[in-house]
Curated annotation (Swiss-Prot):
Lineage: Bacteria, Pseudomonadati, Pseudomonadota, Gammaproteobacteria, Enterobacterales
Domain of life of the organism encoding this protein: Bacteria
Protein name as it appears in the record: Putative uncharacterized protein YbfG
Length: 216
């Protein structure tokens, strides 16, 4: 494994690029402050240099909360966003799967870099869609995904899981919580859906179990 002096590139870091993206962001974005110890641990485990936007974001931040926390981009971890990409892979949803989780949202969507098991387009960002319980490609890499999150049309992407007062409700959530809907999003229904707040890990586990059931 590469040592920290090989991973941290102070002369050619992508951090200034990310700072420009943050400055120009059109979606509400909060940059969580970095903890040096967490940053060094996360970057060492990730083994990606700060010349890349992903390495720079992990080393330079605790993460990003976008759209008042509706979309959460993993950095090196923070009390308000207690996860980083590598530690996240220890969850059962990623057991034996060549993929690196990089973000999630309040509807239970997980975004991950394809390491080869999600499709043929290795290096592209996929998302685990709660309405299909399948991994679907966004056909973009990490940099394009991050720019989309900061300044893209999130309203269109999330049109099926947003309601009139969604922003006020999202602000009340912590980054360890999410909304579950009933009837479930993977069930076609003409009935109006209700929602409640549950643990994010509980929602992931439920979706994972349902996917396993449907694929048996």
């Amino acid at each position: 494994m590469r040592e920290m002096n090989q991973l941290v590139n102070t002369e050619d870091s992508a951090w200034p690029i990310i700072q420009n993206w943050l400055k120009d962001a059109t979606n509400h974005t909060e940059l969580l402050p970095v903890n040096k110890d967490l940053a060094e641990t996360a970057l060492y485990q990730l083994q990606v240099t700060t010349k890349s936007p992903m390495g720079a974001l992990v080393y330079g931040s605790g993460g990003l909360l976008i759209d008042n926390g509706x979309l959460r981009i993993a950095g090196s971890g923070h009390p308000r966003l207690p996860r980083d990409p590598v530690s996240w892979t220890q969850r059962p949803e990623f057991a034996g799967v060549r993929a690196l989780p990089i973000a999630d949202d309040v509807a239970g969507v997980i975004f991950a870099l394809n390491g080869g098991d999600l499709g043929e387009d290795t290096g592209c960002v996929y998302y685990f869609a709660p309405d299909t319980l399948n991994w679907e490609s966004l056909e973009v890499g990490y940099s394009e995904f991050l720019q989309w999150a900061l300044s893209g049309d999130l309203d269109t992407f999330y049109e099926n899981v947003r309601w009139q007062q969604w922003r006020e409700d999202v602000i009340k959530l912590s980054a360890t919580e999410a909304f579950t809907f009933y009837p479930f999003l993977w069930v076609q229904s003409e009935e109006a859906r209700t929602r409640k707040v549950i643990s994010l890990t509980e929602l992931w586990e439920m979706q994972y179990q349902m996917k396993e059931t449907f694929t048996q």
